[in-house]
Amino acid sequence: VDLCIVLAGPTCGRTMAEFGADVIKIDSPHVPKVLRHNDTNRGKRSVLIDLKTKEGLELFWKIVESADVVLQNFREGVAEKLGVGYEQVRARRPDIVYGSVNTYGHLGSFAGRPGHEPIGQAVAGMQVRLGSKKPTTAPFSANDYGTGLLACYGVALALLHRRRTGEGQ
């Protein structure tokens, strides 16, 4: 179940779909259409669900009943506010593998800040090292693609752990 938007999170789900997973992309009616239907969603089935409604949450839980993985890339605290955070999902599905991707991680002084590739490049100092006289953004999203691939790797390892122990992560 893929709740992700933009690039890093959806890249994880797309890679899983390319390797044969049945990925259900849950799109939000609150997200601009341009962010819902791009290259990173190929190979996925898609459904439009408003997680901010009771009916939407009921549909989410119905889908999660038979899922192996839930992916999200919300800003810190947003998944919990929507009722789809790790502990909330784990309470219903203790064996679930829950992948969470964001720009700054879940710990540290930047946790909870919104961000995506260009912001991450600026904070990391990458924009001043690209050879231009003025800070510039790299012409490709190496960090987002790399993050998505590493998230996929982490999900695969968590699935292997679950297969061996029965425990979700």
Model-identified regions with their sequence ranges:
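Conserved small-residue-rich beta-alpha loop and adjacent elements
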Residues: 1-31
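Alpha-helix N-cap/helix-initiation motif
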Residues: 5, 52, 140-144
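Short glycine-rich, flexible loops that bind phosphorylated cofactors or substrates
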Residues: 9, 78-80, 106
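Active-site-adjacent "lid/gating" segments in soluble enzymes
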Residues: 15, 19, 82-169
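Hydrophobic/aromatic beta-strand patches that form the interior of the parallel beta-sheet core
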Residues: 24, 47, 97-99
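Active-site-proximal loop->helix
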Residues: 36-41
